[in-house]
Regions:
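Extracellular beta-strand/beta-solenoid scaffold signature
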Residues: 17-24, 70-73
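Leucine-rich repeat domain C-terminal region
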Residues: 77-85, 137-151, 166-167, 172, ...
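Canonical leucine-rich repeat
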Residues: 16-17, 45, 69, 100, ...
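Conserved hydrophobic beta-strand positions in leucine-rich repeat
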Residues: 4-8, 33-37, 57-61, 88-92, ...
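Consensus "Asn ladder" position of solenoid repeat domains
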Residues: 11, 40, 64, 92-95, ...
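LRR N-terminal entry segment and analogous cap-like coil->beta motifs
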Residues: 1-3, 11-14, 22, 32
């Protein structure tokens, strides 16, 4: 049996000291579908959960202290961990991330359908998750640097060709010229609060 969900929010996980009392050889992971670790002090992506074969489909890591998720955080150097392919939903909002590694491509996460990296520090669009043919929704609202400046300016050209994507949340940034023809398939598009945006919506006017 697999538990529906476990919630470890509002703790001090990831702070100084040892969080796991046993050795990694004895650690068996978490037998749950949804794992919530929001509002902690996590600086390093919890690779241990996936290395031990935890059957996680949704992981919520919002409101932590991660600045990067380096390569081999979701997979070993060769091949993949046993159950990482089960992961469909990833919430990384309210961290300090500036980039994603190739761990987030379809070769590791073939069924990724929902991902949100809003309220981070991306200055360029992380295209790795767009490689997933199952991706339906992606959020990347409100990207700021340490001084609070809007730093995401470039539209992710080609995003309308993602076969399953129906929702893109890219508001509250500084997106400029959009040189791409929109399609009605992308029927939830949040571009609000991009003060310098230039976009042609003629192709989707009949659907608005």
């Amino acid at each position: 049996y697999v538990m529906g969900s476990v919630d470890f929010s509002y703790n001090k996980i990831g702070s100084e000291g040892r969080n796991i009392s046993c050795s990694m050889d004895d650690y068996k992971g978490i037998n749950a579908s949804t794992v919530t670790l929001s509002y902690n002090e996590i600086q390093k992506f919890p690779t241990e959960l996936f290395a031990t074969g935890s059957p996680i489909s949704t992981i919520i890591l919002s409101n932590n202290l991660m600045t990067s998720i380096p390569e081999n955080s979701l997979k070993p150097k060769d091949g993949n961990y046993k159950n990482t392919y089960l992961l469909t939903t990833i919430d990384l909002r309210f961290n300090k991330l500036t980039s994603l590694s190739d761990d987030f491509r379809a070769t590791t996460l073939p069924y990724l359908s929902n991902m949100d990296v809003s309220y981070n520090c991306f200055s360029s669009f992380p295209t790795q998750p767009l490689n997933s043919s199952q991706l339906k929704a992606f959020g990347i609202r409100h990207q700021r640097d340490a001084e609070g400046n809007r730093i995401l300016r470039q539209w992710p050209t080609g995003i309308t060709t993602c076969p399953s994507l129906i929702q893109l949340q890219i508001g509250s940034n500084d997106i400029r010229k959009v040189d791409e023809k929109l399609t009605p398939q992308l029927y939830i598009l949040d571009i609000a609060d991009n003060p310098n945006i230039s976009i042609d919506v003629t192709s989707v006017c009949p659907y608005i």
